[in-house]
Amino acid sequence: MTVDPTWVAAAAAITPGFETVGDPFQAAAGDFDGMGISCGALQWNIGMGSLQPMVLAVGRPVVLAAMPVHGARMWEACSGTVNRGLQIVRGWQSGATLKSSAKAELRALMGTPDMRAEQQKRIDAKAEIAMGLARDWSMARDGTEPTKRLFLWFFD
């Protein structure tokens, strides 16, 4: 099933607005939720293991180029265990707040064309799941196709 691209764009604009400011694809937040760091439009993170596959997919050269100071450690954080990754990224923070150099580099990484493409792949996959759930619910309720509003509800 294909989801209307304008609906996906709306979901990608609305959902991050609850947790991010500015370009959601470049969002980077500290350990406010116990997940180490949370990055990107849908706040993928180290603690749940959702950020690591994205970092590995873009490759070490992209990470090192975008993160000249912290890139090698970011690669290590995403290549090892979740516990080791949490330990590394928590070292870049004061309490639950990212230090400015780490935040700037994470934002740079998340904003690279390769990482934007990785984020979009995952947004599109989530949109397909959301549309399936919305369609199932709508069909069971009254036999109609889901509305955009219903799709957005299931996306978030």
Q: Predicted segments — roles?
A:
Residues M1-D156:
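Cell-wall polysaccharide-cleaving catalytic domain and substrate-binding groove, primarily
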